[in-house]
Structure formats: structure tokens, C-alpha cells
């Protein structure tokens, strides 16, 4: 799973699954942010396979509404360490900055409104809503719908121009 939203001077990538290798990171021209819906293999495995990570060392901010920055750092550094991956990605690519989710909102302030909601998925997951100039996109990845979510999801998605929802 990997989706990209480009708005004005900001590039937002949601999850870095296998499709991430096709994303042209344009961070010399735009602020680049990666946010994760959750941390299952199919949503993080492509991070190291994007060639643009290795040719420009402008900062890329990485975050998730699902957990704090320390937990996210622990998850990604464990996955991309010498134990499970042939290179220690975060020690080699110092421009990958793991930050608290509120730091992403500060960066995006005035550019795009970003909000999140908790989803049902083993290990947890969160959905995101992106709003700008009256238009909105909602992403709900791997949500395992249950009736007790109905009202919250109706409110979170209300008025959205596009809802991307895949479920199990």
C-alpha cells in the first residue's frame, strides 16, 4: 500500500508498501512527509527501495497518528536494521526524521488540514482526512468494519470528495 498526495509545496506519502519505489520524491521543491496508517509488512516494506532517498539528502519527515515518535522509530529501526534487512537504513540516511504527528500538522499548517481516526485492524491502524479549499480526501486502509464504528466513520467521512477504503 502506498498513496501520494501532492498539494502546492507539499508532498504527502501514505504508507511505503511496494509501490513506494515508483514515487518521485521532489523534496528540493516541496516539503516531503511520510505518514503511516499502520506497520504491517505490506505497508512499510518499500521504504528502502525508493532511489530518490539516496540522491538528495533534504529532510523527509516520517510520522503516524497511531503511535508516538519513539515507538515509530523503534518499529522502523528494528525492521530496517541488520537483523532483518541488509543495511541499517536509519543510520545511513540521517535525513529521514521521525517526528511526532503534531509536528506534521505544524508543517502543514496553512497548506492542508490533516486529521486522523482510529480504525479496527490487528495491531491497530488509523485513517486520515486531508482537506484543502473545501475539497477533501479520506483514507481508511485495512479497516475491518464493525457496526460500532458506523457513526464515527460517517462523521469522519462526511462531505469527503473521495474516500479510499480497503478492508479485510
Short names for language-model regions:
Residues 1-138:
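Binuclear metal-dependent hydrolase catalytic cores
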Residues 144-168:
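Cap/insert and terminal regions of metallo-dependent hydrolase folds
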Residues 140-142:
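DG-centered beta-turn motif at the end of beta-strands
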Amino acid at each position: 500500500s502506498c498513496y501520494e498526495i501532492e498539494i502546492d509545496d507539499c508532498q504527502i506519502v501514505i504508507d511505503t508498501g511496494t509501490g513506494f519505489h515508483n514515487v518521485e520524491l521532489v523534496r528540493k521543491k516541496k516539503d516531503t512527509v511520510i505518514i503511516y496508517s499502520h506497520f504491517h509488512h505490506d505497508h512499510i516494506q518499500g521504504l528502502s527501495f525508493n532511489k530518490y532517498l539516496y540522491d538528495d539528502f533534504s529532510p523527509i519527515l516520517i510520522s503516524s497518528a497511531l503511535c508516538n515518535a519513539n515507538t515509530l522509530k523503534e518499529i522502523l529501526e528494528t525492521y530496517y536494521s541488520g537483523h532483518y534487512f541488509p543495511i541499517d537504513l536509519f543510520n545511513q540516511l540521517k535525513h529521514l526524521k521521525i517526528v511526532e504527528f503534531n509536528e506534521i500538522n505544524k508543517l502543514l499548517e496553512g497548506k492542508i488540514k490533516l486529521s486522523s481516526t482510529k480504525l479496527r485492524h490487528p495491531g491497530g491502524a488509523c485513517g486520515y482526512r486531508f482537506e484543502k479549499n473545501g475539497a477533501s480526501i479520506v483514507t481508511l486502509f485495512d479497516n475491518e468494519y464493525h457496526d460500532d464504528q458506523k457513526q464515527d466513520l460517517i462523521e469522519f467521512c462526511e462531505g469527503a470528495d473521495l474516500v479510499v477504503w480497503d478492508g479485510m
